[in-house]
């Protein structure tokens, strides 16, 4: 059994990560889950949320937006729509997006076509703010 996981994260635009890590924690569609070396093979979906990985005593965080995770042979492949590291999140922009989504949701009802899109925008903004607020490595 390997002592590390090979973590690869890819978006449609680019490869975001290719790292040897000790563990990961991901926002699964059915709840948060973790993966350590030797984990049982797994294929699952991700929801919008905070993704983290640990290298030694350092923990790194990313905001991810919907995707898939495959765990096999001490390798974790993450395919997501978007992924932003702490350093690449513009906190002011994320807060502005949160404000816009909150304001728009106050004007809508669940019957409106735009309602669910605004809920998703609100969730993405909240996760981006949470990840940006981590203030560096955990």
UniProtKB/Swiss-Prot annotation:
GO terms for cellular component: plasma membrane; proton-transporting ATP synthase complex. The keyword Cell inner membrane applies. Its main location: membrane. It is found in: Cell inner membrane. F-type ATPases have 2 components, CF(1) - the catalytic core - and CF(0) - the membrane proton channel. CF(1) has five subunits: alpha(3), beta(3), gamma(1), delta(1), epsilon(1). CF(0) has three main subunits: a, b and c. GO terms for molecular function: ATP binding; proton-transporting ATP synthase activity, rotational mechanism. The keyword Transport applies. This is ATP synthase epsilon chain 2. The gene is atpC2. It comes from Syntrophotalea carbinolica (strain DSM 2380 / NBRC 103641 / GraBd1). Produces ATP from ADP in the presence of a proton gradient across the membrane. It is a peripheral membrane protein. Keywords: ATP synthesis, Cell inner membrane, Cell membrane, CF(1), Hydrogen ion transport, Ion transport, Membrane, Transport. PANTHER family: ATP SYNTHASE DELTA/EPSILON CHAIN (PTHR13822), ATP SYNTHASE EPSILON CHAIN, CHLOROPLASTIC (PTHR13822:SF10). Pfam families: ATP-synt_DE (PF00401), ATP-synt_DE_N (PF02823).
């Amino acid at each position: 059994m390997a002592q590390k996981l090979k973590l690869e994260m890819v978006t449609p635009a680019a490869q975001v990560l290719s790292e040897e890590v000790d563990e990961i924690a991901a926002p699964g569609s059915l709840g948060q889950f973790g993966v350590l070396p030797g984990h049982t093979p797994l294929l699952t979906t991700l929801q919008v949320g905070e993704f983290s990985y640990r290298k030694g005593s350092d923990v790194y965080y990313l905001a991810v937006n919907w995707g898939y995770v495959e765990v096999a042979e001490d390798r974790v492949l993450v395919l997501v729509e978007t992924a932003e590291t702490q350093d690449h999140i513009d906190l002011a922009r994320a807060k502005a997006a949160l404000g816009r989504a909150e304001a728009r949701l106050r004007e809508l009802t669940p019957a409106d076509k735009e309602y669910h899109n605004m809920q998703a925008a609100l969730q993405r903004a909240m996760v981006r703010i949470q990840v940006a607020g981590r203030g560096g490595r955990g």
